[in-house]
């Protein structure tokens, strides 16, 4: 999961190639993604409209200021705090900047959540747009998922019970009548899995089992492994990235845990809802835009949102989730709303087309 030491050289060369290709005859704009292609804006700006998508403001590609001399005619925009900052330069030069949810657009304008670029982003005005990502609804489709023991759909959830049984068997948890919560995650500070660790001794009292799939930070993996060994009836941890198991977790889980400290968009909550698994999330970024709290809006709710990214707040949301899940009417209504919502790329694609039109017309 670590980057190569010469990533600055790799992506600078790639960006130069992207810019050269974009400026050839027939192209109407160049669309860059994150810091990896951001340097292309130093050549493209002023010659062809530039759209920049930012998926995570924390990753800016900062490198030595000596790289400025290798950029194009607008290299000065990339100098920031005595370094070369590809993402900052592209934000300054882009004709439109797209962040990956409407709420994340609001967050990046604030000093506490703007990763040092909030002032630059405020200068973009209406050229800063928030467009929620979609998911591949063919790949994430419980009615035709080859990773499941049996297909299921919103009008027949019998296959979901079979998926839960298969999941429990695969990860080694004992039989349990209460809800099974799952998490498919990177082990990184952003994702907030460490906020769950103090709750592990309480899981039995909360009538909750948890299965976590994820890899990344070694210390966090060690802590999860230790917690699972100490509480084998309550917590199962699989240290891996395993797409087949991820599908089974989303299908077999009752609740999805996403205690993110920040989440520009998030895909897991949408994937889980496709499978009738109700999300318990922090109230940040794209999680705010996609999960409606059942206690705040029972008629439209799809999950539960913790008021803050800390252990007490997430515990409170979990308590509410276990209670809500235990009510069959609440559970089924939320499952139906999540499974029938349109999480596809159809809507986001049309909003991207509108953003393209604004910069080329």
Where are these regions (language model features)?
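Catalytic cores of nucleotide-sugar-dependent glycosyltransferases that transfer UDP/GDP/TDP-activated
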Residues: 1-361
């Amino acid at each position: 999961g670590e980057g190569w030491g010469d990533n600055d050289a790799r992506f600078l060369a790639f960006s130069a190639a992207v810019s050269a290709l974009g400026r050839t005859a027939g192209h109407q704009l160049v669309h860059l993604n994150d810091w990896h292609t951001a340097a292309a804006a130093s050549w493209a700006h002023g010659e062809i409209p530039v759209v920049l998508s930012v998926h995570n403001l924390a990753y800016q590609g900062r490198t030595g200021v000596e790289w400025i001399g290798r950029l194009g005619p607008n290299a000065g925009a990339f100098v920031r705090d005595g370094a070369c900052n590809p993402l900052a330069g592209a934000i300054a030069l882009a004709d439109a900047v797209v962040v990956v949810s409407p709420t994340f657009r609001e967050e990046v304008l604030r000093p506490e959540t703007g990763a040092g670029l909030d002032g630059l982003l405020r200068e973009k005005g209406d050229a800063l747009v928030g467009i929620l990502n979609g998911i591949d609804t063919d790949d994430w489709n419980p009615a035709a998922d080859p990773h499941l023991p049996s297909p299921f759909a919103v009008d027949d959830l019998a296959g979901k019970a079979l998926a839960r049984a298969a999941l429990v068997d695969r990860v080694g948890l004992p039989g349990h009548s209460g809800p099974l919560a799952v998490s498919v995650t990177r082990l990184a500070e952003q994702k907030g899995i460490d906020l769950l660790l103090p709750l592990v001794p309480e899981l039995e009292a909360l009538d909750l089992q948890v299965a976590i799939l994820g890899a990344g930070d070694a210390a966090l993996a060690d802590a999860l492994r230790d917690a699972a060994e100490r509480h084998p009836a309550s917590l199962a941890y699989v240290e891996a990235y395993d797409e087949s198991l991820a599908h089974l977790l989303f299908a077999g889980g009752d609740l999805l845990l996403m205690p993110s400290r920040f989440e520009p968009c998030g895909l897991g909550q949408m994937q889980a809802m496709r499978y009738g698994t109700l999300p318990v999330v922090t109230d940040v970024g794209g999680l705010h835009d996609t999960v409606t709290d059942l206690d705040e809006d029972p008629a439209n709710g799809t999950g539960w949102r913790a008021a803050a990214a800390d252990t007490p707040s997430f515990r409170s949301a979990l308590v509410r989730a276990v209670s809500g899940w235990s009510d069959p009417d609440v559970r089924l209504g939320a499952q139906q709303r999540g499974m029938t919502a349109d999480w596809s790329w159809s809507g986001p694609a049309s909003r991207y087309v509108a953003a393209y039109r604004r910069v080329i017309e």
